[in-house]
């Protein structure tokens, strides 16, 4: 059994082959407040009829207290590319396994595979470390601690700090998914504790804006279907009058600020891909908690319009009292099509009575919506950027 090692960039995707086409690295540099990552690739040559080899990895370095090792695992990709609509840069065009999840290594124990590559994600996150060049030595042994191979990496820590991110960086962190994964009920103390941990990691990886579920976000949901209720605004209907309570929204804002969030992306007021319906909104009516709007609601119905007018006025008052109104962004509906232009205009007019045009952001692939001034701040799908770039759109956002 022979173990061959190779150090590669964190940007590389390491598949099962011998990794011969991937450039090797031996050194790197980082600013004092950055996190630096690279990969160690282990390829086992063997004639033994054995697919798994329990082994061990050991880190030797002055930086060892600040180094984490994770094993790169694989997940199936059934449609990695659309045939007829792809360039030559795809790493995988047929169904197969691709590297993605990172699994923490416990007590240095790792799993290698016979005649295949396995990669390990090395993360360096120094705290109060003097600037300089540090050697990181990585040793591989079998489970009985017999030496197999070793290599080393030189990391320079530069006496300077990465400045605060000068752009907006948001992501859709869905509370219902977190609740399901951890088998907790949304809104419980346990849920809020788990949510805080996710938020801190979210900020650590460069996000400064967060999707805020005023009502259950109408996102990635089949028509007629609904996501688990995740609603920060409490709605009551007393004798035909709407009452709005923002206690949970304040708790959310306070938590997000404490974790380092600066900007708030308010959830969409209309459904995706056409803006034809209202999002799922729950309310308590005479003691009964029930859905009052959803897929059955025409987005331009008088009932929903009146609700929005009552709600938006109270929401804006609350956000101003919290002194974050200028740090908030609002959605009408994502990805409207040309045939949705009139519908979108009417819905946006409702919102414009309460917020600035520049605070309204929506995912957009149709350049004509921007050209006509319908969407002032488009968030463009990265595969539809070209016309926006060619026409010199300033302050352009993008998503993928």
Regions found by a protein language model. Give the residues of each.
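Contiguous beta-strand segments within globular domains
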Residues: 25-46, 211
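Short, polar loop/linker segments at the starts of domains and inter-domain junctions
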Residues: 14-29, 184-191
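Extended acidic/polar, glycine-enriched regions
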Residues: 42-50, 107-166, 192
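Active-site clefts of carbohydrate-active enzymes
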Residues: 391-400
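Extracellular glycoside hydrolase catalytic/binding regions
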Residues: 357-385
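Aromatic-lined carbohydrate-binding surfaces of glycoside hydrolases
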Residues: 94, 135-142, 149-354, 365-372
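Surface-exposed binding patches on compact interaction domains or structured appendages
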Residues: 2-19, 46-121
């Amino acid at each position: 059994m022979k173990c061959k090692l190779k150090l590669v960039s964190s940007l590389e995707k390491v598949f099962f082959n011998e990794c011969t086409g991937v450039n090797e690295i031996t050194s790197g540099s980082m600013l004092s407040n950055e996190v630096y990552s690279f990969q160690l690739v282990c390829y086992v040559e063997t004639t033994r009829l054995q697919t798994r080899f329990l082994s061990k990895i050991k880190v030797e370095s002055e930086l060892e207290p600040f180094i984490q090792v994770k094993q790169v695992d694989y997940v199936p990709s059934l449609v990695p590319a659309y045939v007829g609509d792809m360039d030559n840069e795809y790493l995988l065009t047929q169904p197969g396994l691709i590297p993605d999840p990172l699994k923490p290594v416990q007590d240095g124990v790792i799993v290698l595979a016979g005649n295949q590559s396995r990669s390990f994600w090395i993360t360096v996150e120094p705290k109060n470390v003097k600037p300089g060049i540090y050697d990181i030595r990585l040793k591989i042994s079998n489970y009985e601690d017999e030496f197999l191979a070793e290599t080393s990496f030189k990391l320079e820590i530069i006496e300077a700090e990465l400045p605060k991110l000068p752009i907006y960086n948001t992501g859709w962190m869905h509370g219902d998914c977190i609740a399901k994964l951890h088998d907790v009920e949304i809104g419980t103390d346990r849920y809020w504790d788990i949510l805080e941990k996710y938020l801190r990691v979210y900020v650590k990886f460069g996000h400064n804006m967060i999707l805020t579920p005023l009502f259950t976000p109408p996102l990635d949901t089949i028509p007629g279907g609904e996501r688990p209720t995740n609603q920060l605004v409490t709605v009551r209907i007393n004798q035909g009058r709407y009452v709005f309570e923002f206690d949970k929204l304040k708790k959310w804002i306070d938590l997000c600020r404490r974790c380092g969030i600066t900007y708030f992306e308010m959830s969409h007021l209309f459904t995706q891909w056409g803006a034809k319906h209202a999002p799922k909104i729950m309310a308590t009516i005479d003691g009964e908690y029930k859905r009052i709007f959803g897929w059955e609601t025409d987005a331009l119905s008088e009932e929903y319009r009146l609700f929005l007018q009552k709600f938006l006025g109270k929401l804006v008052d609350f956000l101003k009292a919290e002194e974050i109104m200028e740090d908030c962004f609002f959605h009408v509906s994502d990805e409207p099509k040309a045939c949705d232009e009139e519908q979108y205009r009417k819905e946006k007019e409702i919102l414009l009575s309460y917020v600035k045009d520049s605070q309204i952001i929506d995912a957009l692939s149709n350049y004509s919506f921007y050209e006509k001034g319908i969407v002032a701040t488009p968030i463009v799908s990265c595969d539809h950027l070209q016309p926006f770039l060619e026409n010199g759109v300033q302050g352009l956002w993008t998503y993928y």
